[in-house]
Amino acid sequence: SLYPASALVLTVGHGADAATAEVQRAVTLSCRPTPTGTHPAPAQACAELHSVGGALGLLRTGAEPGRMCTKEWRPITVTAEGVWDGRRVSYEHTFANNCFKNAAPTTVFEF
């Protein structure tokens, strides 16, 4: 292959961490050579991942300015497992609730 592999399985689940979260949805995302997968917006998600060099921890997970969410604790955990530019990656992030997840300015976990 001309390109190192960049393929991920992304999940969204109810729970405080990946080990205990009940997975609600899962999609695939492959970014090389062209964006594909079951993710609803693969081109946009791959562009965001390319912008941070595949370092999922650098994606902005805070709410966009002006977005209001309640402080209720109903944790939503997102995960990414797979390979980016030929390197194995494993990522998880927990949002306080679904509003905070949806308020984050990233499409990677919008599915």
Curated annotation (Swiss-Prot):
- Keyword field contains Secreted: yes
Secreted listed as a keyword: yes
The cellular location(s) given in this protein's UniProt record come to: Secreted
Q: List the disulfide bonds.
A: C31-C46, C69-C99
The entry's cellular-component GO terms read: extracellular region
Q: Where is this site: Reactive bond?
A: K71, E72
Can you tell me which residues the record assigns to a coiled coil? none
The protein's superkingdom reads: Bacteria
One GO MF term, please?
serine-type endopeptidase inhibitor activity
Keywords of the record: Disulfide bond, Protease inhibitor, Secreted, Serine protease inhibitor
Q: Which InterPro entries match?
A: Prot_inh_I16_SSI, Prot_inh_SSI_I16_CS, Subtilisin_inhibitor, Subtilisin_inhibitor-like_sf
Q: Name one Pfam family in it.
A: SSI
Subunit note: Homodimer.
What this protein is reported to do is described as: Strong inhibitory activity toward subtilisin BPN' and, to a lesser extent, toward trypsin.
* Family that this chain belongs to: Belongs to the protease inhibitor I16 (SSI) family.
Q: What is this protein called?
A: Subtilisin inhibitor-like protein 12
Identify the species of origin. Answer: Streptomyces hygroscopicus
